[in-house]
Design a protein with these regions (language model features):
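N-terminal segment of the mature folded domain
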Residues: 36-188, 368-378
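Bilobed "Venus flytrap"/periplasmic-binding protein-like clamshell domains
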Residues: 53-59, 199-217
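Periplasmic-binding protein-like
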Residues: 127-137, 233-240, 281-312
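Short helix-loop capping/hinge motifs at secondary-structure junctions, enriched
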Residues: 143-148, 216-222, 309-313
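Extracellular/periplasmic juxtamembrane helices and adjacent flexible linkers that interface
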Residues: 1-30, 39-40, 307-378
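Bilobed periplasmic-binding protein/Venus flytrap-like ligand-binding cleft at the lobe interface
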Residues: 153-173, 192-199, 303-340
Length: 378
């Protein structure tokens, strides 16, 4: 009898210990931040908000295979505008169990850090630029030729460069000139540069930064100071508002422009046309579309901002040579970790070292631009 009682109590103790261990494991998992749970094979699932132009890339079957088999990570990618994601309060990010942000520029990263949000994540916060893509303007061939005839665009080695962005802005856009003034029949109407909404999306904000540098500082290679920016915000706001309704993300803005064959000018990333060619157009270059490289342009970094320890795996994974190769050959992202030969089937792309570049403005100027676009405080 005593022996059976002993066994009974031992069983009870065993059950209690098992329950305590189970509860402890659950609590530790919850405290880990992003709510990332390991699958039966040990793979960690993380949730990441990122720019829409990276959605096809991160969901590429081969990329997902490398992430899972080599790095033990699976990504739930939720497309969200760069400036929208970095302005989400830290408490809300934690409540929604977000493990990382993946905006499309160092400017968006600066907003997250300078606002103090990054500090809320302590040592789990890490930032690393893993991909790059220069800001470009897309044009239909007739519009590009009209700009070339006006001395605004030059063609060198089969690549179109905007060599006089100031002339384009001050002699055509700001005065409200029409495409007919450039002897262009398609498109009709005023000369505009369309973009995604700069209040939420990085490609639109980068266009605004280029416009600001050109109109404010007098030297496009010199980012505008706060004083210069303040004096020119109204001009930039007018250029943006002239577009009318804007898409909230870079990807939807590009897809609308190319599918509807809108013509004219669209600001975006170099990779968007290259990605369209490989993933949507069976490797064929769409007829009648030209990529224009502003001189200078801004190279958009695509930094991963980790909010939990588990998300740090993603940085190492995207820096993997095999994934960097896929990023370029299938999705047109220039590598953020090493130098690759810039050769893309059917398209002439300028080598990185030959592209004339300028820097984005500092945080104070970015904040002025955001306040202007979001709250109309210009």
């Amino acid at each position: 009898m005593k022996k059976s009682k002993g066994l009974f109590y031992a069983g009870i103790v065993g059950i209690v210990v098992a329950l305590v261990i189970g509860v402890a494991v659950i609590m530790m998992s919850k405290r880990s931040g992003g709510g990332n749970a390991a699958t039966h094979d040990g793979t960690v699932k993380i949730t990441c908000y990122g720019g829409s132009e990276k959605e096809d890339f991160i969901n590429d079957p081969q990329v997902k295979k490398i992430l899972r088999e080599k790095y033990g990570v699976e990504v739930n990618f939720i497309a969200k505008g760069s400036y929208k994601q970095v302005q989400i309060p830290a408490d809300e990010l934690k409540a929604n169990k977000v493990d990382c942000l993946w905006p499309s520029s160092a400017s968006a990263q600066a907003v997250f850090e300078e606002s103090g949000s990054s500090k809320a994540f302590g040592n789990d916060y890490q930032a690393a630029s893993v991909l790059q893509s220069p800001e470009v303007l897309y044009a239909n061939t007739e519009a590009a030729e009209g700009l070339k005839n006006a001395g605004i665009v030059q063609v060198r080695d089969n690549v179109y460069f905007i060599v006089d962005f100031r002339k384009l802005l001050e002699e055509y856009l700001l005065p409200g000139k029409s495409w007919a003034d450039l002897a262009v029949a398609v498109p009709s109407g005023p000369v505009l540069i369309n973009s995604s909404d700069p209040a939420t999306s990085n490609s639109g904000m980068t266009l605004a930064q280029l416009e600001l540098a050109t109109t404010a500082s007098g030297n496009p290679y010199q980012p505008a100071s706060t004083a210069q920016a303040g004096a020119s915000l109204a001009k930039v706001k007018a250029l943006i508002e002239a577009q009318g309704l804007m898409r909230t993300g870079s990807n939807s803005a590009f897809e609308q422009w190319i599918i509807q064959q809108t013509g004219g000018l669209l600001a975006g990333y170099e990779n968007q046309l290259l990605q369209w060619i490989t993933t949507r157009n069976a490797g064929a270059v769409p007829a009648g579309i030209v990529t224009l490289y502003p001189e200078p342009t801004i190279f958009n970094d695509h930094p991963i901002l980790t909010l939990t320890a588990a998300a740090k795996k993603l940085i190492a994974a995207i820096e993997d040579d095999a994934i960097q190769d896929i990023a370029w050959t299938r999705y047109g992202f220039r590598p953020g970790t090493r130098v690759l030969e810039q050769v893309f089937p059917g398209v002439t792309v300028p080598p990185t070292h030959t592209i004339k570049k300028t820097q984005a403005p500092g945080y104070a100027v970015i904040k002025l631009l955001l306040d202007c676009f979001v709250t109309n405080h210009c």
